[in-house]
C-alpha cells in the first residue's frame, strides 16, 4: 500500500481497497476540487479532507461510519423539544450560508477552506450538493450539507448556533429522506456525536457495495427542490 499522487490531467482514482491503514483510509493526494473529480470521488466512496496549507488529501476509511435513517436515536428530551420546536426547517434555501456556517463555527479550526466552499457551491449549482437550514424566525441558527448519490446521502458537515439546531436538521432530513425512498446517510468517520445519534461502523467493502447499488437509485424528481420541510406549531 502506498500513497498515490493524483494527476491534474485525469480524474481517475485508485481503488479504495489500496488505502493506508495508518492513517486510516488515506488513499491519495493532489489533484483538484473540480466538480468532475469530486463527483468521481463520491461515486467511488472517497472524500477530501485536509488542513489549510496542506495538499488535497483523499480518504476512504475502513470501517466506514453510516447512519440508517430509521435508526436515528432521538432522546426523550429531544422528542419533547421537537414537539414544541421554535424552528423552521428548509431545504436548499441557503446553501452558501450553511457551508459558511460550518466553516466558521469550529473553534479548533476547520478544513472547510475558501477553495472548499467554492468547490461545493459549484456542486450545489449543478444539483449534486444540498443543504438543510434551521431558522429561528429569520435567523439561520443551524444546518447541514452534503452530496447526494441516488438514495444515499453523503453528509459533510453540520453546525449549530442554538439549542438542538443541528439535531433538528438531521431529524427532519431523516424523516423526509425515509419518506421518499432514501436508504442511507454516510457519516464518513464515527465520533462521539454521530454515535450518540445512532451512527455505526460497517466494513468499507460493505459500504462500497451499498454505494454501488444506491447511487443508481432515484428519489422523486422534485425531492431536492427548495422547500419548507417543517414549521413550528402556531
Curated annotation (Swiss-Prot):
Gene Ontology CC: cytoplasm
InterPro entries per the UniProt record, alphabetical: Acyl_CoA_acyltransferase (IPR016181), Leu/Phe-tRNA_Trfase (IPR004616), Leu/Phe-tRNA_Trfase_C (IPR042203), Leu/Phe-tRNA_Trfase_N (IPR042221)
Subcellular location: Cytoplasm
Top-level taxon: Bacteria
The protein's Enzyme Commission number: 2.3.2.6
Record key words, sorted: Acyltransferase, Cytoplasm, Transferase
A GO molecular-function descriptor: leucyl-tRNA--protein transferase activity
Matching Gene3D superfamilies: Leucyl/phenylalanyl-tRNA-protein transferase, C-terminal domain (3.40.630.70), Leucyl/phenylalanyl-tRNA-protein transferase, N-terminal domain (3.30.70.3550)
Pfam families: Leu_Phe_trans
Record-given protein name: Leucyl/phenylalanyl-tRNA--protein transferase
Chief subcellular location: cytoplasm
This protein's record includes keyword RNA-binding: no
Protein purpose: Functions in the N-end rule pathway of protein degradation where it conjugates Leu, Phe and, less efficiently, Met from aminoacyl-tRNAs to the N-termini of proteins containing an N-terminal arginine or lysine.
Catalytic activity from the UniProt record: N-terminal L-lysyl-[protein] + L-leucyl-tRNA(Leu) = N-terminal L-leucyl-L-lysyl-[protein] + tRNA(Leu) + H(+); N-terminal L-arginyl-[protein] + L-leucyl-tRNA(Leu) = N-terminal L-leucyl-L-arginyl-[protein] + tRNA(Leu) + H(+); L-phenylalanyl-tRNA(Phe) + an N-terminal L-alpha-aminoacyl-[protein] = an N-terminal L-phenylalanyl-L-alpha-aminoacyl-[protein] + tRNA(Phe)
Family statement: Belongs to the L/F-transferase family.
Biological processes, Gene Ontology terms: protein catabolic process
